[in-house]
Swiss-Prot record:
Family statement: Belongs to the UPF0344 family.
NCBIfam families in the cross-refs: PRK13673.1-2, PRK13673.1-6
Transmembrane segments: 1-21, 36-56, 67-87, 99-119
Keywords: Cell membrane, Membrane, Transmembrane, Transmembrane helix
Protein name: UPF0344 protein SAOUHSC_00907
InterPro entries the record matches: UPF0344
One GO CC term on file: plasma membrane
Predominant cellular place of this UniProt entry's protein: membrane
Membrane topology according to the record: Multi-pass membrane protein
Pfam families per record: DUF1516
Source organism of this protein record: Staphylococcus aureus (strain NCTC 8325 / PS 47)
The UniProt record lists the keyword Transmembrane helix: yes
Compartments in which it is found: Cell membrane
Keyword flag Membrane: yes
Length: 129
């Protein structure tokens, strides 16, 4: 399940950037916008479902850091929401660059939290998890 989660969020980030850049300020949406946005939503849903499943498994094992897991879950849900809001603002031709960079910053924070959690590579490297 962890591999599905990692694959889905990597593809979601790539699709988010592609979808965001497929909206021109002068010409509007490109013909590829709608399919990209739908595929992005699919991968965001896969990311949320697999992340929730990993959260449940970690809570059941008992040895996990529950506060960091909950914080990462909240950051992940916020990332999904900010992705949708920044794309919607861009689609309506509103100022969306600030929202885009806030989303990117929150993606990085969420990734750092994922790296230091018990299933992350830092914990596996030092034998903590």
């Amino acid at each position: 399940m962890l591999h599905l989660h990692i694959l889905s969020w990597v593809l979601a980030i790539i699709l988010f950037i592609a979808t965001y850049l497929n909206i021109s300020k002068n010409q509007g949406r490109s013909p590829f916008f709608k399919p990209l946005h739908m595929i992005l939503r699919l991968f965001m849903l896969l990311t949320l479902i697999s992340g929730f499943w990993i959260l449940i498994q970690s809570f059941m094992n008992g040895g996990a850091n529950h506060m960091l897991l909950t914080l990462k879950m909240l950051c992940g849900v916020a990332v999904v929401g900010l992705m949708e809001v920044s794309i919607a603002k861009r689609k309506r031709h509103e100022q969306s660059h600030t929202m885009f960079w806030i989303t990117i910053a929150l993606i990085i924070i969420t990734m750092v939290l994922g790296v230091i959690l018990p299933l992350g590579p830092i914990s596996k490297l030092f034998g903590i998890g």
